[in-house]
């Protein structure tokens, strides 16, 4: 049972005229207004960044690889953290799936605890996290990757 809340998060997938859902909804316990996050997520078409999510990322090699059927973009979690999380919070993800949340948590400097019951997805997300961490270690020196 979901209790009443004034604040829902609406993720507009900016997917145009397709058979897929235009939006996804996330319940929150915050006592604020409904907020919308626009970020393209339609097959190979993915948004550019948090500020320009409705604009297609032009460099396909920078797109997130899909490893889970209900995968969300890292940018969605980054936006949620930016708008709702407080410094010093320790975050919990009980359905980690693709680890998009964990990438956003780590990038923003949050400690976290995560769970995934499917060993296949767990293995995939561990590999994804290791790849992400190695990219940060090797290449993030204030220079934009191309």
Map each language-model feature to its residues.
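Class I S-adenosyl-L-methionine
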Residues: 3-146
């Amino acid at each position: 049972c979901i209790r009443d809340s004034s604040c829902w998060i609406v993720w507009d997938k900016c997917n145009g005229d397709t058979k897929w859902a235009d939006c996804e909804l996330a319940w929150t316990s915050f006592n604020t207004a409904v907020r919308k996050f626009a970020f393209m997520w339609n097959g190979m078409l993915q948004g550019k960044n948090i500020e320009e999510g409705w604009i297609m990322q032009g460099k396909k090699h920078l797109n997130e690889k899909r490893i889970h059927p209900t995968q969300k973009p890292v940018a969605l979690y980054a936006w949620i953290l930016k708008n709702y999380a407080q410094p010093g919070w320790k975050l919990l993800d009980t359905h980690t799936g693709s680890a998009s949340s964990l990438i956003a948590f780590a990038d923003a400097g949050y400690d976290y605890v995560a769970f995934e019951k499917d060993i296949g997805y767990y293995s995939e997300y561990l590999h994804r996290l290791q790849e992400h961490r190695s990219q940060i270690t090797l290449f993030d020196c204030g220079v934009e990757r191309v």
